[in-house]
Amino acid sequence: MDSYKVIELANKYSAAAEEVRSSKMLLESRLSALGDAWQGKARDSFDQDFEETKAAYDQFEQELLETSQELKAAAVKIEERKAEIARMEELERKAREERHKLGR
């Protein structure tokens, strides 16, 4: 498995989290721009729904970031395992060479 592909995927998750954050901030700024121009029961209902939506945005952003971090950690483990395998292969190669020398 290629750790670079895993890191690339992790970066895509981070970018998606940033897009979610930006989208939420845009919605907040547009709502703020309305100020007191929109009032009443419909506004109160909207505000309540919007608070729930913001919480969902925050949760989704957090999950994307956590997934990104987990993928990056997995990429590190992949590289560690590759290094361990390479080290073991080198030890096996040296052992074969030593056996070959002793067999002469």
Curated annotation (Swiss-Prot):
Coiled-coil ranges (or none): 42-104
Keywords carried by this UniProt record: Coiled coil
InterPro entries in the cross-refs: ESAT-6-like_sf, T7SS_ESAT-6-like
Matches recorded under Pfam families: WXG100
Family: Belongs to the WXG100 family.
Protein name: Uncharacterized protein YfjA
